[in-house]
Each structure stands twice: as structure tokens, then as C-alpha cells.
Design a protein with these regions (language model features):
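A non-catalytic, amphipathic alpha-helix used as a structural packing/dimerization or gating element
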Residues: 64-75, 98-102, 221, 225-228, ...
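Eukaryotic N-terminal low-complexity, Ser/Thr- and Lys/Arg-rich leader segments
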Residues: 1-22, 249-255
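Alpha-helical bundle segments that constitute or directly flank the non-heme di-iron/ferroxidase center
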Residues: 37-42, 57-86, 106, 155-165
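Hydrophobic alpha-helical segments
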Residues: 19-20, 24-28, 32-33, 140-146, ...
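Long amphipathic all-alpha helical oligomerization modules
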Residues: 193-226
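Short alpha-helical hairpin
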Residues: 6-14, 20, 33-57, 76, ...
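Acidic, carboxylate-rich catalytic segments that either coordinate divalent cations
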Residues: 4, 223-255
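Active-site-proximal alpha-helical scaffolds that flank and shape metal-associated catalytic sites
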Residues: 20, 91-198, 227, 231
Length: 255
């Protein structure tokens, strides 16, 4: 197996002629990625992601994740709907609409397919109890979508798009020899593609343009939004691995 690791150099000269690539990021994208690097790489090495790539992840853990993610995707779509309402640039409006529709149609179909094979009904999916970690994540991005401007919204939705594109790509390369027999192959297949990565490219490009005249204080605010999102991605998977609904496992006994 060939492991694909992230570059540790985030201070290189961006080659605009090549366009945005995984190893050719514009300056502000480099700053965001560098700021999140510790949690980003710990996220890729955490048990949920490793076992998913190996195909050894317990089905119960994956089902817990899928049910929580099913709820998350619906809120993610709402964030894009709010972004659509706030946007004045037709190109941004079109992107928000595209992602909203894709989240509700394409991604939820993968969830439904897996969950149906596990004997989980549509009613159970729609009535699943949201974990504290998932609720913290969605509450954060919804709060930004309601109370902030379009640039904040673009940065808030970037971690989900970028982390999934990166992890999917790296898992597909690292476990290429065994992926065909992996029960989670369709999950990896969905996120490994260049087509999925292009959503991140679009976001990175437009964020870069919108921060061009921003103050340093404003840029730091946006970096904080981004890093918080990457941290929430980490905890989303970690809590799914532990199948944990509450902040502390023992608190679940009172529910």
C-alpha cells in the first residue's frame, strides 16, 4: 500500500498558471490549511478513518455515523440555502444552489443505501437523536449562516468539503490494493473523485478573491472559523466511533 501524506510546506509560492491544486494552494488557503494542520492530520489518523480505509470498521459504528451525518447533511443544505439568500453574486448563488441540491440528492442516497442494508428504516433515519457533537457542529455553521456575511458562510462550509475530499483521495490511494473488497468502498469512491474536489477548488478560489482587501484582523477571524470547522469534523468522527450521544458517556444514562 502507498500512503499519501499531506505536505508540511504551506509557505510556497502559488503558481497561478497551474490553478488551484492539492499541492498548489493560494496564499490565504495555505494559511488556513497550516493553521488546521495538527487536527487535520490527527483526524486522518484517528481510528474511525483508519478502520474505514482498512474495511474493518464495525458496522454499528458506521451506522451511527451515517445516521448523524444524515441529519448533518440536511443542516448543511440549510446553510447553503441561507447563503443563497444572502449572496448577491450570481455565480455564488448558483454554487450554493448546486451544493444544496447535491447534498439532498446524491449524498443522502448513499446514506439511505447503506442504512437500508442495515435494516434501518426511513422513519428511524428521520427521527434519530442528534449527538451533542453533531449538534455543536451544525449549530455553529447555522449560527454563522444566519448572523454573518457570505464570506463567513463560504469559510464555514469549506472544512466539510475540503476534509472529505482530502481524506477520500488519500484513503483511495493508501488502500488501493484492498479497496475493491472494502465494504465501505462506495463511501470512499464518492469522496475521492476530482469532481468532488472541485467544490473545494471553487470555494478556495472565491474565498481568496473575497479576502484580498480584508484586514489582518478579519483574516484571523476567518481562519478561526475554518479551524473550528476542522475540529468539529474530527469530533464528529470520534464521537461516532465511540457511539457517544452526550459530552460524557455516563450522562447518556440519564436520557
Amino acid at each position: 500500500m502507498t500512503a499519501v501524506t499531506s505536505t508540511t510546506d504551506f509557505d510556497y509560492e502559488f503558481d497561478a498558471a497551474k490553478g488551484i491544486q492539492r499541492n498548489n494552494l493560494p496564499p490565504f488557503a495555505q494559511r488556513m490549511r497550516k493553521a488546521a494542520d495538527l487536527v487535520w492530520e490527527e483526524g486522518y489518523q484517528q481510528p474511525f478513518i483508519r478502520e474505514l480505509g482498512e474495511g474493518t470498521l464495525q458496522r454499528e459504528r458506521f451506522a451511527f455515523y451515517l445516521l448523524q451525518d444524515f441529519r448533518y447533511v440536511n443542516d448543511y443544505a440549510r446553510v447553503h440555502a441561507l447563503g443563497l439568500a444572502k449572496a448577491t453574486d450570481p455565480e455564488i448563488m448558483a454554487f450554493m444552489l448546486k451544493v444544496q441540491n447535491g447534498a439532498l440528492q446524491v449524498e443522502t442516497e448513499v446514506h439511505r443505501s447503506y442504512l437500508a442494508s442495515y435494516g434501518i428504516t426511513e422513519e428511524q433515519m428521520n427521527n434519530v437523536r442528534q449527538s451533542a457533537f453533531a449538534r455543536a457542529y451544525t449549530s455553529n455553521i447555522l449560527s454563522i449562516a444566519y448572523g454573518k456575511d457570505i464570506l463567513d458562510i463560504l469559510v464555514a462550509v469549506l472544512p466539510c468539503a475540503w476534509v472529505y475530499a482530502d481524506y477520500g483521495y488519500r484513503l483511495a490511494a493508501e488502500f488501493a490494493d484492498t479497496l475493491d473488497n472494502n465494504p465501505y468502498k462506495s463511501w470512499v469512491d464518492m469522496y475521492k473523485t476530482d469532481e468532488f474536489w472541485q467544490d473545494s477548488v471553487w470555494l478556495l478560489d472565491h474565498i481568496e478573491k473575497l479576502v484580498a482587501d480584508a484586514s489582518e484582523e478579519r483574516k484571523r477571524e476567518l481562519i478561526d472559523i475554518f479551524v473550528t470547522g476542522v475540529e468539529n469534523e474530527y469530533m464528529f468522527w470520534a464521537s461516532a466511533y465511540d457511539m457517544q450521544y452526550t459530552w460524557k458517556p455516563e450522562w447518556n444514562q440519564a436520557r
